[in-house]
């Protein structure tokens, strides 16, 4: 089997494996009592990761340069990065729910590259003069890895919003994931429930108070509210989160923060490397090319996210919404500007 045939087989195999893996993760989420299904999902993601890595390696050997010169190659590198970050996030969170959100994205990317792009864009071609530089690997690979990490982190933020149904849940963990009302039989009640509390509750957590009601046979109740709440407050009843759902939400919030914290410095390094390469190739560090502009917008969005988490102490819904918007911004930066068909970075134009 020659390298071209191997690549054709591997790209189709990667799509098939990711499709089956997506189904396994969805079945595992629908029927949590089947741990073998979840284990098979993890194995499928690892197999897909290895298949894509083998495809990229074969293409590297065939073409003689790092396979990031066109849209087809970058899409597969992006899907490889997403599967890699997925495996890291899943191992860190010990939650198979991560795959419910990341696998469809990885599969969609592979499907787009394999089934949508014309065949002439899937063939290795000699590098254009502007890409004949050692900066190709340094700049493009780091940018693609940053996109992968930021996408996965944003997907986990979207998963957090789904788990909490978009409600503003107050988490007791720090920005690096310590603490939280997820043990000792407590459940966290949201604003809107009927609560009865003493006139002067003990103040904790920068103005928030932890209040406990009597045991009613269903476990104690932990209520997080402002310390200035009067002795008895009647609010409109709302649905509470189960301890399991609350614990999962806190885990997703923490893992999302950590993954984005990994992707942001990669994005910073990639932008700096690109500026140096641009000066070497075109005589200017920054030319406000559409790709450069959206890379800066992406950097600002996630810089705001990390600033809100680290400096302002934001957790829960607000940073999750910001990260979810970052998911859209990353896609515009990576693929949207290529659809414009103009600019110094329009190598991926395919219409």
From Swiss-Prot:
One of its GO terms (cellular component) is plasma membrane-derived thylakoid membrane. One of its GO terms (molecular function) is heme binding. InterPro entries: Cyt_c_assembly (IPR002541), Cyt_c_biogenesis_CcsA (IPR017562), Cyt_c_biogenesis_CcsA/CcmC (IPR045062). May interact with ccs1. It comes from Trichormus variabilis (strain ATCC 29413 / PCC 7937). One of its GO terms (biological process) is cytochrome complex assembly. Keywords: Cytochrome c-type biogenesis, Membrane, Thylakoid, Transmembrane, Transmembrane helix. The keyword Transport does not apply. Required during biogenesis of c-type cytochromes (cytochrome c6 and cytochrome f) at the step of heme attachment. Belongs to the CcmF/CycK/Ccl1/NrfE/CcsA family. It is found in: Cellular thylakoid membrane. The chain crosses the membrane at residues 17-37, 38-58, 68-88, 97-117, 143-163, 259-279, 286-306, 320-340. HAMAP family: CytC_CcsA. It is a multi-pass membrane protein. The keyword Transmembrane applies. The gene is ccsA. This is Cytochrome c biogenesis protein CcsA.
